[in-house]
Regions:
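A short, basic-hydrophobic beta/loop patch
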Residues: 119-173
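Transmembrane alpha-helical hairpins and terminal membrane-anchor modules
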Residues: 273-332
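Charge-rich, solvent-exposed alpha-helical interaction surfaces
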Residues: 24, 31, 109, 228, ...
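Charged, amphipathic alpha-helical linkers/stalks
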Residues: 163-209
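Long, charge-rich alpha-helical interaction segments
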Residues: 197-200, 204-254
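Juxtamembrane amphipathic/hinge helix adjacent to a transmembrane helix
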Residues: 250-271
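Short alpha-helix boundary/capping and kink motifs at helix termini
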Residues: 2-133
């Protein structure tokens, strides 16, 4: 094992506002873990996380729920050794809480967590450096333990992960309070803020601005964008952690709007949401045809003329459906 007692603690290098918001989220995670496995505590966690589980959730799951585009640029760097302040780590108390450790084992465990380092299979943290937050991939339980005993640092392997600059992100406030809050990256990619109040606290501390859709130039129709997001159920928990599974590309919306605006030719049978009522139409056509045939056998000029007229009407009705054309937008 490596001795790290002479190493300086990892410096987060973020603004005071971001550091405060990051620490607040980590504090919340500690409290949330205490609800895990509870009779109503676990269902409460499941509802808040938008999924279902049987224990405390991993730190990256919480961060991914609160922060949009979290892994958009996750170019993980080489791992390095560091002493990490547990107040800025999202851990998980999955198998127990700090007070479950026997009192006689506490000093030895504190010394081991604080001063020695094994392999990354034992303790590995991902550092979202621009946000000042670390998530525990391995070594999750020691976060709450070291915090409970007021310890300043955990010896850990750390991998630095990137995050888009604040200038590239815009939070979009809804005009209707019943609509979802959105986050947009590079004026092209959109995600739903499923926990908007928590997300706003973090993103505004990071430096992200809040705007409304109508104030953004060269954007597709907001209703069309929200419809596309609802069709893909982007307001629900995604099936994977891939950013593509929770992101709408506005270029796709632009392309679809262009295609929908193209003029197309339709017959009467192509009218959407309508079914041709053929019985009445067919009855009139058949009636004209039958009467015309009957009148054609009557040897009287006026009757023959009437029969020819009805025959013409029947023929026109028969051909009319195939000749009628409607020109309009592909979609209204």
């Amino acid at each position: 094992m490596d001795d790290l007692q002479d190493m300086a603690p990892l410096q987060l290098g973020v603004s005071p506002a971001m550091e405060h918001a990051a620490a607040a989220l980590c504090n919340l995670k500690i409290e949330m873990d205490r609800y895990a496995r509870g009779f109503i505590g676990q269902p409460y966690l499941d509802d808040w996380m938008g999924t279902h589980g049987t224990c405390a959730y991993w730190g990256d799951e919480l961060l991914r729920l609160a922060v949009p585009f979290l892994d958009w640029e996750r170019g993980v760097g080489e791992r390095f050794k560091a002493l990490v302040d547990p107040r800025h780590v999202l851990g998980a108390s999955i198998k127990g809480l700090p007070e479950h450790i026997p009192e006689k084992d506490v000093p030895e465990r504190i010394a081991r967590y604080a001063k020695t380092l094994g392999s990354s299979d034992h303790v590995l943290y991902f550092w979202y450096k621009p946000l000042g937050i670390l998530t525990a991939h391995e070594g999750k339980h020691r976060v709450a333990f070291m915090r409970a005993h007021d310890q300043p640092a955990i010896a850990a392997w750390v991998c630095e992960a990137s995050y888009p600059a604040a200038e590239r992100i815009t939070v979009i406030a809804p005009n209707d309070e019943r609509d979802d809050w959105l986050a947009m990256l590079d004026e092209r990619y959109v995600q739903v803020l499923r926990r908007p109040r928590v997300s706003l606290l973090l993103l505004q501390a990071y430096g992200v601005k809040v705007r409304r859709w109508r104030d953004l130039p060269d954007m597709p129709n907001e209703a069309r964008v929200r419809q596309a997001m609802n069709e893909r159920k982007l307001h629900r928990n995604p099936k994977t952690i891939a950013e593509a599974d929770r992101t709408l590309d506005l270029e796709v919306v632009h392309q679809r709007a262009h295609e929908d605006a193209e003029p197309v030719i339709r017959t009467i049978h192509d009218l959407e949401h309508h079914r041709f009522e053929w019985r009445r139409y067919g009855a009139v056509l058949a009636g004209c045809l039958v009467i015309a045939m009957i009148l054609s056998f009557v040897d009287y000029p006026l009757t023959r003329s009437a029969g020819m007229l009805l025959m013409g009407i029947a023929t026109g009705l028969a051909w009319g459906l195939s000749l009628i054309r409607f020109v309009g937008r592909r979609r209204s």
